[in-house]
Amino acid sequence: MARRYNSQLSPVIMIPGSSATENRFDGMVAQLNSDQPKKHGLLKIKVMNNGKMKFKGKISARDTEPIIVVGFENNRDGYSNIKKQARMFNECFAQLYERYEFNNCKCIGHSNGGLVWTCFLENYSKNYDVSFKKLMTIGSPYNFSEQSMKKKSQMLSDFIKYSYRLPDDLIVYSVAGTETYTSDGLVPEKSVEAGKYIFQGKVKSFTQITVTGD
């Protein structure tokens, strides 16, 4: 208990989107480390459908801000799979929590990875004595392919319903990447913007960022 309380470890835990693997962020991590005197370690975990986990990489004892990427064998789309992935991620997080004894972390989710993080934070985060400091979602379709808030997906309705379970000290950034001002061709901008109905007023702060151009 004392060791966890005094821990300096603050991992950045990333979840890729549908059809992506635990290798999704390799390029970004390499670029991040290229101009840093102090390199971030990279631990990659693949959660198999049978519950087993494959670990690759390591976290050094002196690394206070390692990057952990969690991918899934079941990386398909759809609300039922998002819930399955959140449940499997919880099992993975429990192992990380016991093994590394951290008391806080930062969260990044790309596309459906942001949905998995949101589902986890609403349903499982209270199980851990951890401060979830920041959540950044990148192009996460909170209303799936719907173009309008007039038609809410079941997932969005549930996320809004259970948003009171979100950590109240969480800082959230929602990034919408668009080639035009309407849609990036894959995720409707309105679907990303729907995140505000989940987070505003429920977390410490919520900021939506729209990136346009190349």
Give a label for each model feature.
Residues M1-I108, N112-D214:
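Lipid deacylating catalytic domains
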